[in-house]
Regions:
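Well-ordered alpha-helical segments within folded domains of soluble proteins
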Residues: 71-86, 113-130, 165
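Low-complexity, Ser/Thr/Pro/Gly-enriched N-terminal "stalk/linker" regions
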Residues: 22-76, 84, 88, 92-93, ...
Length: 170
């Protein structure tokens, strides 16, 4: 009888301890979403006040923000974060921002000298296509894939990763 009561008590302890873990996970996830929203809000406020379309990459040692051109391999990450913020929060204020920063990358679809166009267009246009049903983004995605395919080397069976200048060819 003592063994049965001990087993029952242990089972009860295990089952009750499992319930709190879910709340901790939910809080952890929500805290991270809230943090991302706060960071994106600060960044978009700064950019929108500038009157320019800027693409942040990192914070410099002096605390200033480093912005990048659209042909930088990280250029799709900021628009992608706008799409993720829109998707995670459902807040409509993020939709026009996601569209604006995504559509600023339109010319990336023609980059044939860059092997990272998948990051650039996947994070931006592809997220818009799948998260907001932006069917018009499909043409940009396909054109980008065609540009990237010009880097395919049949003998190697791979896409060339060598960066070329705009005037050079593979």
């Amino acid at each position: 009888m003592k063994t049965i009561l001990s087993a029952l008590g242990l089972s009860l302890l295990i089952f009750t301890s499992c319930g709190g873990q879910k709340k901790v996970e939910v809080d952890f996830i929500q805290d991270n979403i809230d943090n991302a929203v706060a960071q994106n809000t600060i960044q978009t406020d700064i950019i929108e006040k500038s009157g320019k379309i800027l693409n942040p990459r990192t914070i410099n040692k002096d605390g200033s923000i480093s912005y990048i051109p659209i042909d930088d391999w990280c250029s799709g990450f900021f628009p992608g974060s706008m799409w993720l913020t829109y998707n995670l929060t459902g807040d409509q204020k993020w939709l026009p921002l996601a569209e604006k920063y995504t559509e600023a990358l339109d010319s990336v679809k023609h980059l044939k000298w860059h092997h990272d166009v998948g990051f650039m267009i996947g994070c931006s246009y592809l997220n818009g296509y799948r998260m907001a049903d932006k069917k018009e983004y499909k043409d940009v995605i396909i054109e980008t894939a065609k540009s990237l395919s010009t880097r395919f080397r049949p003998n190697a069976g791979a896409v060339s990763y060598t960066h070329l200048r705009a005037h050079e060819t593979l």
